[in-house]
From Swiss-Prot:
InterPro entries: Growth_fac_rcpt_cys_sf, IGFBP-3, IGFBP-like, IGFBP_1-6_chordata, Insulin_GF-bd_Cys-rich_CS, Thyroglobulin_1, Thyroglobulin_1_sf. Keywords: Apoptosis, Disulfide bond, Glycoprotein, Growth factor binding, Nucleus, Phosphoprotein, Secreted, Signal. This is Insulin-like growth factor-binding protein 3. The gene is IGFBP3. Interacts with XLKD1. Binds IGF2 more than IGF1. Forms a ternary complex of about 140 to 150 kDa with IGF1 or IGF2 and a 85 kDa glycoprotein (ALS). Interacts with humanin; humanin competes with importin KPNB1 for binding to IGFBP3, blocking IGFBP3 nuclear import and IGFBP3-mediated apoptosis. Interacts with TMEM219. Interacts with RXRA; this interaction modulates the transcriptional activity of RXRA. Interacts with LRP1; this interaction mediates cell growth inhibition independent of IGF1. Residues 210-285 form the Thyroglobulin type-1 domain.
Length: 291
């Protein structure tokens, strides 16, 4: 019984590892120059016991560990055979490389259209790669797991370095700059709106009479700031006079072609007797609205 294949995001990180060219030098604990770490579950005795028997030696020239976080053994791919993120690993001294001149090398590895080639023949990837740092002397754990038999069943940690893929690197910089510019613009707009709201509240508090209608209107506007969607059907903004009290005529918003109904209230918002709250058509409130 074979273990499950790795998740798609782990596969994408593995593909970026395949494209990064010569391995970066490691110092100390081996974390310098490394990117995100994908930690796999340990290949204990129970996990190994679930593996099917390894293929016989005559057909397989070399046995390697399964791709990703697999613990079982499988046949290694020979030089020139198709390979990719989800296929078996290449044999010792080989590395899965995208076809020369492919405009989308990362997608080629995800689709299994790569080729097992000599690990030292990195010149084929030179058009796609950034210049690597000098002093590269040892391969990372991911290189061993992708192209050799040294990484067998056991606890494994795939250390995925930062991508050296030039087009992705350039596009990511452009995207990050765009996001930073949008975030700054949103911050300025938000601070401006917050300042306007604070000024409005300060001016209203300085008024001699702070009526109930004005308080309801401010509560409604403050509530709208936290809504993701604005639906005029469920929102009622009261009709207030200059002193913050209710005007005689209050109306609901229209719903498409259907006009909203109106009703009459006193200065405190209480419906006046003798007027249908859901009356249709124009409602003429007695005692003209206060100016």
């Amino acid at each position: 019984m074979l273990r499950a294949r790795p998740a798609l995001w782990a596969a994408a990180l593995t593909a970026l590892t395949l494209l990064r060219g010569p391995p970066a030098a490691r110092a100390g604990a081996g974390t310098m120059g490394a990117g995100p770490v994908v930690r796999c579950e340990p290949c204990d005795a129970r996990a190994v016991a679930q593996c099917a028997p390894p293929p016989p030696s005559p057909p397989c020239a070399e046995l390697v560990r399964e791709p990703g976080c697999g613990c079982c053994l499988t046949c290694a791919l020979r030089e020139g055979q198709p390979c990719g993120v989800y296929t078996e690993r290449c044999g010792s001294g080989l590395r899965c490389q995208p076809p020369p001149g492919d405009p989308r090398p990362l997608q080629a590895l995800l689709d299994g259209r790569g080729l097992c080639a000599n690990a030292s023949a990195v010149g084929r990837l030179r058009p796609y790669l950034l210049p690597s740092a000098s002093g590269n002397g040892s391969e990372s754990e991911e290189d061993h797991s992708m192209g050799s038999t040294e990484n067998q069943a056991g606890p494994s940690t795939h250390r995925v370095p930062v991508s050296k893929f030039h087009p992705i690197h350039t596009k990511m910089d452009v995207i990050k700059k765009g996001h930073a510019k949008d975030s700054q613009r949103y911050k300025v707009d938000y601070e401006s709106q917050s300042t306007d709201t604070q000024n409005f509240s300060s001016e209203s508090k300085r008024e001699t009479e702070y009526g109930p209608c004005r308080r309801e209107m401010e509560d409604t506007l403050n509530h709208l700031k936290f809504l993701n969607m604005l639906s005029p059907r469920g929102i009622h903004i009261p009709n207030c006079d200059k002193k913050g009290f209710y005007k005689k005529k209050q109306c609901r918003p229209s719903k498409g072609r259907k006009r909203g109904f109106c009703w009459c209230v006193d200065k405190y918002g209480q419906p006046l007797p003798g007027f249908d709250v859901k009356g249709k058509g124009d409602v003429h409130c007695y005692s003209m609205e206060s100016k």
